């Protein structure tokens, strides 16, 4: 049986996956079979961690908002704040609120005070 060297097509395929793995260490960037396995593994990790990143950032935003709110009022926390925002129909998402809490704390205190004023007025009217 004659030997087939596969030629251009196989070389092009190997070159493509070698380029992908050029930053990997050791055999993971040199051996074709190992490169193919590590490429699959890298893509799986990237896919999984895109979802994990969304969860992690949401958790970070919530922590930052909660810290900023609790500085102001001892009895007031994140869940009450978000609930009152929805009742007032203030459409600010968690990412924006966290940025405001970090970069401009006075602004988040203004939002907080607006909500508190309206809530206190409603409670006062209910008592009367």
UniProtKB/Swiss-Prot annotation:
Q: Is the Chloroplast keyword given for this protein? A: yes
Query: Which GO molecular function annotations are given, in alphabetical order?
Result: rRNA binding; structural constituent of ribosome
| Residue intervals passing through the bilayer | none
- InterPro entries per UniProt: Ribosomal_bL20, RIBOSOMAL_L20_CS, Ribosomal_protein_bL20_C
Q: Which PROSITE patterns match?
A: RIBOSOMAL_L20
Compartments in which it is found: Plastid, Chloroplast
Q: What keywords would UniProt list here?
A: Chloroplast, Plastid, Ribonucleoprotein, Ribosomal protein, RNA-binding, rRNA-binding
| Pfam name, any one | Ribosomal_L20
One GO process term, biological-process aspect? translation
Q: Is NAD there in the keyword field? A: no
Q: Which GO terms describe its cellular component?
A: chloroplast; ribonucleoprotein complex; ribosome
Primary site of residence: plastid
Record-linked Gene3D superfamilies: 6.10.160.10, Ribosomal protein L20
Database matches in PANTHER family: 39S RIBOSOMAL PROTEIN L20 (PTHR10986)
Its subunit composition reads: Component of the chloroplast large ribosomal subunit (LSU). Mature 70S chloroplast ribosomes of higher plants consist of a small (30S) and a large (50S) subunit. The 30S small subunit contains 1 molecule of ribosomal RNA (16S rRNA) and 24 different proteins. The 50S large subunit contains 3 rRNA molecules (23S, 5S and 4.5S rRNA) and 33 different proteins.
Question: HAMAP family of this UniProt entry?
Answer: Ribosomal_bL20
The protein's job, in short, is: Component of the chloroplast ribosome (chloro-ribosome), a dedicated translation machinery responsible for the synthesis of chloroplast genome-encoded proteins, including proteins of the transcription and translation machinery and components of the photosynthetic apparatus.
UniProt family annotation: Belongs to the bacterial ribosomal protein bL20 family.
Record protein name field: Large ribosomal subunit protein bL20c
Q: Whose protein is this, by species?
A: Spinacia oleracea
Gene symbol here is rpl20
């Amino acid at each position: 049986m004659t030997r087939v060297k596969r030629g251009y097509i196989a070389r092009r395929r190997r070159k493509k996956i070698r380029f992908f793995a050029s930053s990997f260490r050791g055999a993971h960037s040199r051996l074709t079979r190992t490169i193919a396995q590590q490429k699959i593994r890298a893509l799986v990790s990237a896919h999984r961690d895109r979802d994990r990143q969304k969860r992690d950032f949401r958790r970070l935003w919530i922590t930052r908002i909660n810290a900023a709110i609790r500085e102001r009022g001892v009895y007031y926390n994140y869940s009450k704040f978000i609930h009152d925002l929805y009742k007032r129909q203030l459409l600010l998402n968690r990412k924006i609120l966290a940025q405001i809490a970090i970069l401009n704390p006075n602004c988040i205190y203004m939002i907080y005070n607006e909500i508190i004023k309206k809530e206190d007025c409603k409670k006062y009217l209910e008592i009367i």
